[in-house]
Amino acid sequence: MGLELYLDLLSQPSRAVYIFAKKNGIPFQLRTVDLLKGQHLSEQFSQVNCLKKVPVLKDGSFVLTESTAILIYLSSKYQVADHWYPADLQARAQVHEYLGWHADNIRGTFGVLLWTKVLGPLIGVQVPEEKVERNRNSMVLALQRLEDKFLRDRAFIAGQQVTLADLMSLEELIQPVALGCNLFEGRPQLTAWRERVEAFLGAELCQEAHNPIMSVLGQAAKKTLPVPPPEAHASMMLRIARIP
Ligand SMILES: N[C@@H](CCC(=O)N[C@@H](CS)C(=O)NCC(=O)O)C(=O)O
């Protein structure tokens, strides 16, 4: 069996892995794990990842979780262009500098709107307005720091070329945009960065990867999204309760 990627394109880190593999012509079998249908909770998927999360890479008997580990594995195994994950020590360290900051400040912050606007209501849970407001402020602060500390006068997050950092970042920042919160508005520096990254990746690939999340709000309004099965509700409610 060749390379298998277990993904759901509603998931930010899954999209980063998908886009990376596609952009670099890496052959893989897509194993879609539909989170809304609770497929990640199935016994079958638990055998692949006992953490019950996507993305997951399976390369023969080798199983790897965590999107950044997966991206680094793919970069090295398929010898993709150096700019993604530079061999130069300091350039590579800057990619990790961002990814560390990203895990603390971006991941977990920009996905909240999906819970407040779509997933909570889908299972009948309303997120308190004060949490929504707090999240809005956290996003503004994180964007400011992203611009001031990382982008500065550079074309991309970790320098003058596209790296894994840009891909991870873009996929998180797209999530609120899909839900009607265009956080790029009034931020020319960030908008120019987004345009550069998307131009590099190609409009067609971006559209393909972003389609499911871009249509989620419309589907929620039309009530065509599958309601997650009851066994998924407890973990979803826990996730919502953890929103700071
Ligand atoms: N740090 C992990 C995050 C993985 C993760 O949280 N995946 C989410 C989708 S974005 C998931 O599978 N959630 C299912 C659940 O927690 O029940 C990574 O970057 O791969």
Curated annotation (Swiss-Prot):
Q: Which PROSITE patterns match?
A: GST_CTER, GST_NTER
Stated EC number for the protein is 2.5.1.18
Give start and end of each GST C-terminal domain. 88-230
Q: Where along the chain is glutathione bound?
A: H40, L41, K53, V54, E66, S67, D104, N105, I106, R107
Q: Which GO terms describe its biological process?
A: glutathione metabolic process; response to salicylic acid
Q: In which tissues is it expressed?
A: Highest values found in liver followed by testis, adrenal gland, kidney, lung, brain and skeletal muscle. In liver, highest expression found in central vein limiting plate hepatocytes. In lung, expressed mainly in club cells of the bronchiolar epithelium and, at low levels, in type II alveolar cells.
Gene3D superfamilies of this UniProt entry?
A: 1.20.1050.10, Glutaredoxin
- Mainly resides where? cytoplasm
Keyword Transmembrane helix attached: no
State the GO CC annotations: cytoplasm; cytosol; nucleus
Self-association and partners:
Homodimer.
Function, as annotated, reads: Catalyzes the inactivation of reactive sulfate esters in carcinogenic arylmethanols. Highest activity towards ethacrynic acid and cumene hydroperoxide.
This protein's name = Glutathione S-transferase theta-2
Whichever gene encodes this chain, its name is: Gstt2
